[in-house]
């Protein structure tokens, strides 16, 4: 926290900087954490320079951005932004513990989460530094980039229910194999996504559980994830609709009942033009070169924070574009440039007229 040091009309408002401190299973050390540490270092540098900002600066460290323990993403940032659906608190983890119970065990009060939200009029904007999680910056030989928008995203959970049976006694023509239906759906999802290159459409099935899960038993149930993303809401929605139609056809043909549950649907979150300009100027001051703009295919806390305020993001080059992996890596030099760019961005926001 850096309190405002100069009087003026924005003295009672604050600029928010942050990211998340959770990550996926078997991941790296930079996804999310970099943005929190960069914000802390930026505060130190501003204080070292003796810069008096006309607004407060607050660093946020979000939890539950990834949706690993619970089937819901952006829980902390949605709380701060005042857009958390209270029914989410009843979701349970693999051990049956609801979110509200976990919060209570941690010392929180799930019945008063609404009081944690910022008021829109109190916030100037939200900035986040994050590794790119893709290969573009590295391929162009550039350390930093300006995020133009965060892609439209949908997450779904599918349950295929067939009929379990003996692997050796049920003829192939009489089977209702839930896993075989799921496998066909996976290939169908891939086919649909490959046709959406112009819309930056991607779709992934990354998790599947089969029951009863024995080598000599025909699978009676398969529960699996589906992640669909695109550069536009229309493209993502159209792909999801086509997947639903094809899933119905597969289920009918195979005699398998397939349900689709929507876990999350988030529209494109566009960065505010005035923040993009401030970030571009900050990056140019730090690197000496004009930065490029990039669409973020990965989801970020900005998708929730845009419900509260304008958002802007700085992307940092990562090796080979690898993320959500222990091989995830960013160099000290690039991270240092990101901190410099963040400082320069904050200075330009303090000097400028703000939202335009």
Regions found by a protein language model. Give the residues of each.
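Acidic/His- and Gly-rich active-site-bordering loop/insert found
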Residues: 1-28
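Zn-dependent metallopeptidase/amidohydrolase metal-coordination segment
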Residues: 18-19, 220, 290-341, 349
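Acidic, glycine-rich active-site loops and adjacent beta-strand->loop/helix elements
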Residues: 21-23, 57-68, 133, 164, ...
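A short beta-alpha structural unit
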Residues: 204-213, 225-232, 257-276, 297, ...
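Alpha-helical metal-binding/catalytic segments enriched in His/Glu/Asp
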Residues: 17-20, 26-66, 154-160, 169-192, ...
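Midchain, well-structured core segments that form catalytic/ion-binding scaffolds
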Residues: 64-65, 69-234
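Flexible, glycine/charged-enriched surface loops at secondary-structure junctions
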Residues: 52-56, 113-117, 169, 191-205, ...
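His/Asp/Glu-rich mid-to-C-terminal helical/loop segments that flank catalytic regions of hydrolases
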Residues: 148-150, 166, 170-195, 235, ...
